[in-house]
Amino acid sequence: MASACWAAAEFQRIKEEIEAYARSHGFAKNVKATIEARGLVIRVLTDDLLFASGQATLQGRADGLLSEIAQLLNVDETHPISVEGNTDDVPIHSSQFPSNWELSTTRASTVVRFLIGHGVSPIRLTASGNAEQRPVDSNATAAGRARNRRVEIVMRRIHAAAGEGESEP
């Protein structure tokens, strides 16, 4: 139980630091951190910050933010981290990205490589792409589509095994 309390407090501290960094660097509209059942979720809208439209190469503006996130994720090296790429429902058909599946997966992998390059242990990381399958908003409007184009970095909760942490009578 003590480790669960520690994790909750640590997630809250990291959340607050990410939000403060985003505010102080003008990214508050693009970066949101929430604590959910699956863990600490850092949502970064990709437009004008991480990637150009239809691309998976990090833009220069992303370096400071992702460096800060990497540093904060390294405070506790026990929690696994998943990086999930998401797109809107506008189809992409390029030689590099035949569909949104390839684009979202490549964007997640690009962020994973950045985090590894900034000290996050690769054993903690996974990358996945959701294409347009997990929207957080409607794809009917430009604003909704922009919110769906995102990368989520999830510092996952560690669930105790059955009986772990329980004392014997």
Protein language model annotation of sequence segments:
Residues 43-45, 82-87:
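Glycine- and acidic-rich phosphate- and metal-coordinating loops
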